[in-house]
Amino acid sequence: DVYQLLHQQGVMLESKAFAMGVRVEHPQSLINERQLGRGVDIRLTGSAEYALTAQTLNKTSAAYSFCMCPGGVLVPCASEPGTLATNGMSYSKRNGKFANGAIVVPIPSSQKLFDGLTLQRQIEKNAYEAGGKKYSAPAQTIKNFLAKKSDKILPPSTYSCGVVPSNLWSWMDKKICSSLAEGFINFDKKIPGFIDKGLIVAPETRTSSPLRITRNNDTMESLNTQGLFVLGEGAGYAGGIVTSAADGVRLANRAKKENSSIP
């Protein structure tokens, strides 16, 4: 709604590339063993992480891990009624029984300004309906995702609103699904068991904004709207907590430089 409002008021926006996909969960013990070795004392090393990338065979797309949460949990993060999106987090000790991470596919910037946002919203609406319209998340084992069939019974998940079996191919973007499938096959070669022990919980749509409010890189002010300073994730200049905070520090330092009364 904010993007539409800004556009109606004449604020300059532009389409940008972003990424969408799913969240995957695995037993943390599997990730620990594959990444650190059998018998390692996790109390000394901490829970293991992974960073994975794979290019599709035709080299037109890719899949990669993002925001991996060792010993973490999955959480809902819908921002509109009738939509569903997931995210992941780890508590400070990172000692939960499950690891989760986003596995996402690049979405190129579109020629039409709101095409990326429209696709994002459609996937979130489809997910809400596939989950039973009660904010339960549609889920599928990676093994059955590759076979394009629903599960009868799902393994445990940390997602707080519960999960329901769903064939993701029936409601997610087919290009995203195809790239994810190739990615999973590649990742299983790097982390054996990634397919057999993996559960998909969908969707992960909020890696970054599909739109950017254009700004002057030096002043951080909108290019055509005086007094509007844009920063952080929603404005299209960050992809997470730390990068958003860093963008805020830039603006604070600039304001302090121009106004000597700021302590």
Where are these regions (language model features)?
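Residues forming the flavin
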Residues: 1-263
